[in-house]
Regions:
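Bacterial N-terminal signal peptides
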Residues: 13-26
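Catalytic-loop region of hydrolases
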Residues: 28-104, 119-120, 267-272, 281-364, ...
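Cap/lid segment of the alpha/beta-hydrolase catalytic domain
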Residues: 102, 111-185, 228-229, 236-239, ...
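Glycine-rich nucleophile elbow surrounding the catalytic serine of serine-hydrolase chemistry
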Residues: 116, 192-202
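A catalytic-pocket lid/entrance helix-loop region that shapes and gates access to the active site
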Residues: 158, 202-204, 209-312, 443
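Alpha/beta-hydrolase fold nucleophile elbow
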Residues: 183-194
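Short beta-strand/loop motif that positions the catalytic acidic residue
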Residues: 405-407
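Histidine-bearing beta->alpha loop at or near hydrolase active sites
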Residues: 438-452, 466, 484-486
Length: 528
């Protein structure tokens, strides 16, 4: 019996030692306090702020003179990163409390040309338990005006914008995560839409070790080709004074497209489920006599056809980039915001890309643009920096990386056909079997640019890529919901009950209504 007592005593000492070690480990998890992070030595930059943010504290939003309330408490760290002498990258890292942290890091991308830390998306990420970081891509906006003159005379800032800012932000974030929590993150993910999608794919291609999983929405990855498409549309609508399509005529165009294609999926609901199968011919809209709100003049019809077809090199006959699908022309803040009108966003962005990025001329006139000449020059001179359309993702895939692409079919900013083209390029380059091991594309019917529109636009692609990376369970569909307020996913506001749910099927499959049950419920659809 004595030897049993000795064993029992030894066992008790072992258990006590284990408990002590666990206690020490727990005590060291946050051994670096939030305030102490302000003194942390940072290579290639300096920390400008390290402070606690309490729930309901106001988070400033630049360049707007406003803010939004924090939904949870966290440690806010702001830094200035200077990888070169001409670099000024403002970035932030938000660290949830140790007991709230899910053990993962989420980098978030920007929209437009960046110019401000994407605090809206970071707010949603930290509320879900992620340590999250974002940056301004190396330049600072002072207003909401679309301008790119900050790059003139600053080639290093163009590199920061194109790819470097997100990479050095990921490096600094991981360093401080380990210091704050006492250990590194379990997984690192990145999510971005629009230019953020461009950033996401640049990370996968140029820095495949930065992230374990990436979500790229509506990616502006073929940057120079997309810009050429923007310019093509601007020129088409300004070919003659009569070429402009007024906003008042968009309803007639959409009505005609829906009449031809809405019912193809078995449900007539104002949403074309698969616009790729819609071969809309707008010729019936040609005015028979006098101009009117329900018809198009010949110059307007010519311009519309060019928007649908996409830019073509007149010298070679080769298509430079795809055009836009039909059926969503009259949606608010869609074609009216992005395509038509002298101050459309497409025109504003294209004029800056070619005027500032390519020609370094703040007074450049778009009427001097030659598509064949200038698009080729853009591809040669700035394309190698800006384009993240390389389909060879073998280094990312070899690390076990997972990629989810998504796009709204009603997107009037980045053509959905361009994202499909990139997905097919990956399949061709890497082989379909290999591509299926790490990449999926989800098309969202009725969703506009990144969110909004009549279709379900709220879905958690980050959770899907996390599940895929952690458990090797590839997503074959995403559950998408439509709420009364589309911004609910961004703001973190309680969305209430969804108005519509639908499955987003892994491309090329499309959701089809079974013919029974409510067409507003996802369970009544199948992917095929």
């Amino acid at each position: 019996m004595a030897h049993i007592s000795v064993i029992r005593a030894s066992l008790m000492r072992t258990v006590a030692l284990a408990i002590a070690l666990v206690a020490c480990a727990q005590a060291s998890v946050a051994s670096t306090t939030c305030e102490d992070l302000g003194k942390f030595p940072l290579a290639g930059g300096n920390i400008t702020l390290a402070a606690r943010v309490a729930p309901n504290d106001t988070i400033p939003m630049k360049p707007l003179n406003t803010g939004m309330p924090a939904t949870v408490g966290f440690c806010r760290v702001a830094v200035t990163l200077t990888p070169t002498s001409d670099s000024t990258i403002l970035a932030e890292l938000w660290l949830p409390d140790a007991e709230k942290w899910n053990g993962k890091f989420l980098g978030v991308g920007n929209g437009g040309f960046g110019g401000a830390v994407p605090v809206g998306d970071m707010r949603g990420a930290v509320a879900k338990g992620y340590a999250t970081a974002g940056d301004d891509l190396g330049h600072q906006l002072t207003s909401l005006v679309v301008e790119g003159t900050w790059v003139i005379g600053h080639p290093e800032k163009l590199k920061d914008f194109a790819y470097r800012a997100d990479h050095v932000t990921a490096e600094f974030a991981k360093t401080l995560i380990a210091a704050y929590y006492g250990h590194a993150q379990q997984r690192a993910y990145f999510r971005g839409c629009s230019n953020g999608g461009h950033e996401a794919l640049m990370e996968a291609q140029k820095y495949p070790a930065d992230y374990d999983g990436i979500v790229a929405g509506a990616p502006a990855n073929s940057f120079t080709h997309i810009s050429a498409g923007f310019m093509w549309n601007e020129i088409a609508l300004n070919e003659t004074p009569q070429s402009q399509i007024p906003q008042s005529k968009l309803a007639a165009i959409q009505k005609a497209a829906l009449a031809q294609c809405d019912a193809l999926d078995g449900v007539k609901d104002g949403i074309i489920n698969d616009p790729a199968s819609c071969h809309f011919d707008p010729s019936a809209l040609l005015c028979k006599s006098a101009d009117g709100p329900e018809c198009l003049t010949k110059p307007q019809l010519t311009a519309l056809r060019k928007i649908y077809s996409g830019p073509v090199n007149a010298k070679t006959g080769k298509k430079i980039y795809p055009g836009f699908p039909a059926g969503d022309e009259a949606l608010a803040h869609n074609w009216d915001l992005w395509i038509i009108g002298p101050q459309s966003f497409q025109a504003l962005f294209a004029n800056q890309v070619f005027g500032s990025f390519l020609f370094n001329d703040p007074h450049w006139d778009f009427r001097t643009f030659d598509l064949a000449r200038d698009s080729m020059r853009a591809d040669q001179e700035i394309g190698p920096l800006l384009n993240s359309n390389d389909p060879d993702l073998s280094a990312f895939a070899a690390r076990g990386g997972k990629l989810i692409l998504f796009q709204g079919w009603a997107d009037a900013a980045i053509t959905p056909f361009g994202t499909i083209q990139y997905y097919r390029d990956i399949q061709r380059k890497m082989g379909n079997n290999e591509a299926q091991q790490f990449v999926r594309l989800f098309m969202a019917p009725g969703m506009m640019h990144c969110s909004g529109g009549p279709g379900p636009d709220n879905f958690d692609a980050v959770a899907a890529v996390d599940q895929w990376r952690q458990k090797n369970e590839a997503p074959e569909s995403l559950l998408a919901s439509k709420y009364a307020v589309s911004a609910a996913a961004l703001t973190g506001a309680p969305p209430g009950e969804p108005l519509i749910t639908r499955p987003l099927c892994a491309y090329p499959r499309v959701a089809h209504w079974t013919g029974s049950g409510s067409s507003d419920k996802a369970e009544n659809y199948v992917c095929r």
